[in-house]
Regions:
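Hydrophobic beta-strand-centered segment that forms part of the acyl-chain substrate-binding groove
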Residues: 34-68, 72-74, 78-80, 96-101
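Hot-dog-fold acyl-thioester-processing enzymes
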Residues: 1-49, 106-120
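HotDog/MaoC-like acyl-thioester-processing domains
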Residues: 1-5, 60-61, 72-120
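Short, well-ordered turn and helix-capping elements at secondary-structure junctions
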Residues: 11-13, 50-57, 87-89
Length: 120
Protein backbone atom coordinates (compact mmCIF):
# COMPACT_ATOMS: atom_id res chain seq x y z
CA UNK A 1 0.00 0.00 0.00
CA UNK A 2 1.09 3.56 -0.70
CA UNK A 3 1.24 6.46 1.74
CA UNK A 4 -1.14 9.01 0.17
CA UNK A 5 -1.71 11.63 2.87
CA UNK A 6 -0.17 12.61 6.23
CA UNK A 7 -1.86 15.21 8.43
CA UNK A 8 -1.91 16.23 12.09
CA UNK A 9 -5.20 15.98 14.00
CA UNK A 10 -5.92 19.46 15.41
CA UNK A 11 -8.13 20.56 18.34
CA UNK A 12 -10.69 22.31 16.13
CA UNK A 13 -11.75 18.90 14.72
CA UNK A 14 -12.80 17.35 18.04
CA UNK A 15 -16.26 16.05 18.91
CA UNK A 16 -18.12 16.04 22.23
CA UNK A 17 -15.97 13.10 23.43
CA UNK A 18 -12.81 15.17 22.82
CA UNK A 19 -11.65 12.81 20.08
CA UNK A 20 -11.37 13.68 16.39
CA UNK A 21 -14.72 13.89 14.57
CA UNK A 22 -15.24 10.89 12.28
CA UNK A 23 -16.36 13.11 9.40
CA UNK A 24 -12.97 14.84 9.38
CA UNK A 25 -11.23 11.50 9.02
CA UNK A 26 -13.74 10.36 6.39
CA UNK A 27 -13.01 13.43 4.25
CA UNK A 28 -9.27 12.74 4.40
CA UNK A 29 -9.84 9.09 3.46
CA UNK A 30 -11.86 10.28 0.46
CA UNK A 31 -9.04 12.61 -0.64
CA UNK A 32 -6.43 9.88 -0.18
CA UNK A 33 -8.50 7.57 -2.38
CA UNK A 34 -8.58 10.25 -5.06
CA UNK A 35 -4.79 10.54 -4.86
CA UNK A 36 -4.54 6.79 -5.49
CA UNK A 37 -6.90 7.04 -8.49
CA UNK A 38 -4.95 9.93 -10.02
CA UNK A 39 -1.67 8.09 -9.48
CA UNK A 40 -3.16 5.02 -11.16
CA UNK A 41 -4.44 6.96 -14.17
CA UNK A 42 -4.65 10.75 -14.50
CA UNK A 43 -8.11 12.22 -14.86
CA UNK A 44 -11.14 13.46 -12.96
CA UNK A 45 -12.82 11.11 -10.48
CA UNK A 46 -16.00 11.25 -8.44
CA UNK A 47 -16.66 9.26 -5.29
CA UNK A 48 -19.64 6.98 -5.95
CA UNK A 49 -19.57 4.59 -3.03
CA UNK A 50 -18.24 3.82 0.38
CA UNK A 51 -18.46 0.07 0.20
CA UNK A 52 -16.97 -0.55 3.64
CA UNK A 53 -15.98 1.67 6.54
CA UNK A 54 -14.77 0.66 9.98
CA UNK A 55 -13.58 2.94 12.77
CA UNK A 56 -11.26 0.71 14.80
CA UNK A 57 -9.78 3.12 17.37
CA UNK A 58 -10.19 6.82 18.16
CA UNK A 59 -7.95 9.57 16.81
CA UNK A 60 -6.71 12.11 19.36
CA UNK A 61 -5.51 15.69 19.09
CA UNK A 62 -1.84 15.70 18.13
CA UNK A 63 -1.90 12.32 16.41
CA UNK A 64 -0.06 12.15 13.10
CA UNK A 65 -2.60 10.53 10.77
CA UNK A 66 -1.19 8.59 7.82
CA UNK A 67 -3.53 7.20 5.17
CA UNK A 68 -2.33 4.29 3.07
CA UNK A 69 -4.08 3.31 -0.16
CA UNK A 70 -4.02 0.53 -2.71
CA UNK A 71 -6.06 -0.33 -5.79
CA UNK A 72 -8.38 -3.22 -5.05
CA UNK A 73 -10.07 -3.40 -8.45
CA UNK A 74 -10.19 -1.54 -11.77
CA UNK A 75 -13.44 -1.75 -13.72
CA UNK A 76 -14.45 -0.27 -17.06
CA UNK A 77 -15.05 3.22 -15.59
CA UNK A 78 -14.36 2.73 -11.88
CA UNK A 79 -11.54 2.15 -9.44
CA UNK A 80 -12.09 0.58 -6.02
CA UNK A 81 -9.51 1.66 -3.45
CA UNK A 82 -8.64 0.05 -0.13
CA UNK A 83 -7.77 2.62 2.54
CA UNK A 84 -6.10 2.18 5.92
CA UNK A 85 -5.62 5.10 8.32
CA UNK A 86 -2.90 4.71 10.91
CA UNK A 87 -1.66 7.09 13.57
CA UNK A 88 1.49 7.82 15.48
CA UNK A 89 0.48 9.04 18.92
CA UNK A 90 2.27 12.02 20.46
CA UNK A 91 4.17 9.65 22.76
CA UNK A 92 6.00 8.29 19.72
CA UNK A 93 4.27 4.92 19.62
CA UNK A 94 4.38 2.63 16.63
CA UNK A 95 1.70 3.09 13.98
CA UNK A 96 -1.76 2.04 15.15
CA UNK A 97 -4.55 1.24 12.69
CA UNK A 98 -7.56 3.47 13.44
CA UNK A 99 -9.78 3.18 10.35
CA UNK A 100 -10.22 0.93 7.33
CA UNK A 101 -12.36 1.46 4.26
CA UNK A 102 -13.15 0.48 0.71
CA UNK A 103 -14.21 3.35 -1.58
CA UNK A 104 -15.27 3.33 -5.23
CA UNK A 105 -14.57 6.18 -7.64
CA UNK A 106 -15.74 6.69 -11.23
CA UNK A 107 -13.57 8.39 -13.83
CA UNK A 108 -15.49 11.19 -15.57
CA UNK A 109 -15.10 13.54 -18.51
CA UNK A 110 -15.60 17.32 -18.46
CA UNK A 111 -19.40 16.83 -18.51
CA UNK A 112 -19.20 14.52 -15.45
CA UNK A 113 -20.18 11.51 -17.55
CA UNK A 114 -18.40 8.19 -16.95
CA UNK A 115 -15.22 7.79 -18.97
CA UNK A 116 -13.52 4.51 -19.76
CA UNK A 117 -10.32 3.73 -17.91
CA UNK A 118 -7.60 2.82 -20.35
CA UNK A 119 -5.75 -0.38 -19.53
CA UNK A 120 -2.08 0.28 -18.91
Amino acid sequence: MNLSISVFALPKYTNSKNTIFGGWLLSHLDLAGLVECRNTQPGRYLTVGIDKMKFVKPVFVGDLVKIYTGVEKIGRTSITVKLVAKVNRMNGSDEITVTEGLFTYVKTNDENEPEEIKKI
